[in-house]
């Protein structure tokens, strides 16, 4: 029994030992193999995701690399690129390509380890498991890229981006000269809107611009002079004789120091002492004499006096400018006198011009020039001939007064215009031009007109009427343009020229211009709000308001093509006489020839191209140089005639280049550029 009991105990122990062994096996399995499976699976997933990111980055770098290589190829020649490729291949493991081929991060590299040693480990026994794993990773990465990245939309967007980058790179590399010039011009236009004065003032490279104005001391001294005058008047009223004398002494010192200085640099060294001394005297005067009402009254009186002085000076300036425009310079007067004397010393047979048979030939090109200025007339003729293609076909009809008839003849006898024909006439020998036929001559004989012209104390002697008191408005040479068919009865067309113009191109094409039945061919001068009829005519008069449009465009005298056949048909001279008689009291327009010309040729003027006639060189300083150089005729209309000292220096060379200043007559009369 005991033996059985012992055997049964042993069996129980064995049974319990077998159960604990199975539990131990399960415990070891879960503790070892489960984590092992987890880490192995996670490692596979990480490797696949790394491969995916590496492939995508590699693709992104590939297209950037291709774009960069295209730009590089456009910049360097093939030989240079071959040298670069050879040098790059020779770098071996130091090359960027070898770095990119290694999938590991740079932080995993061992320093001091030979790369060739790592790559040479077990070259003949490749790891089968690693190869299988790499194949699986490649297949996984390719599938995931095709599913997640290589969609048609993304491919299309990437292609568009590549095209835009290529186009931009080509534009930057292949800019030609025209494109660069356009960009420069655009930059210049944008810079015009920038106030360069402000930029210069605040430039860190020009610190002197940050200082006070260059005339600050002068303005301070002028202010002190004004206040010294004010306090001098008050001191005189209050019998402060000592202070008055001191103020007057300092006032004289300040005025002496100021002189004609326009900037602080013009002031003497003692200016600062004078400023300080005057400031002390003014402070003393303010303590003793300051009275708000008295000071204000004195300043107002001084302001009113200054305004009156300004108006007087403006009127005087206008008068002097008009007077200067009327005068003939001494050298030109000398030239006229010398030529006149020499002309009347000639025998009658030597006073005739050649080729007189051309004067009435309608197949030639005829010019009408009415002038009493020998030098100006010579410039018109010379400039026309020098720019004519065939001078032998040009005929010049000059008309002057009896005072300049000899001088005009003598000049062109000594200086004939080449093969061209020229003829000089005296307006005083036109017997048909008398007061019974010509309204202007009849009006000039009236007492009212003589009073208007020759009495300076007349109520209308203001600056607004000074320009109409020019002697040219009294001369029949100025009104002879309205009698062209009577002066040249056998001509069909004639080109009228003023004596203050120069010709820069051949004018013969003007005879081929179709005037479309009009009488006058002229260049229009009107802008948006100026040089229209309301500027020249009195539209408060019912005769003017009824017959003309105030916004009608004005045109210019100076170069006009007249069709004399149409002139005779339409009785242009009769129309001129009618309106001139109506304007006897100057109620329709002021004196001059342009207003009656606008009226007479109203609706009968054919507009010419503006390039034929450029005006304003006698008053406008801002005419475009290109317009002047491209013009066929340049007109110095205005007071600043090119033969006067008033002339604008930048326009004068266009006129003087047609004068031979080495001519003996010009040298004797001291005529020079």
Swiss-Prot record:
It catalyses: [(1->4)-alpha-D-galacturonosyl](n) + UDP-alpha-D-galacturonate = [(1->4)-alpha-D-galacturonosyl](n+1) + UDP + H(+). Residues 112-136 are annotated as: Disordered. One of its GO terms (biological process) is homogalacturonan biosynthetic process. Its main location: Golgi. Pathway: Glycan metabolism; pectin biosynthesis. The gene is GAUT1. The chain crosses the membrane at residues 23-43. It is found in: Golgi apparatus membrane. Residues 44-673 are lumenal. It comes from Arabidopsis thaliana. The keyword Transmembrane helix applies. Pfam families: Glyco_transf_8. This is Polygalacturonate 4-alpha-galacturonosyltransferase. One of its GO terms (molecular function) is polygalacturonate 4-alpha-galacturonosyltransferase activity. One of its GO terms (cellular component) is Golgi apparatus.
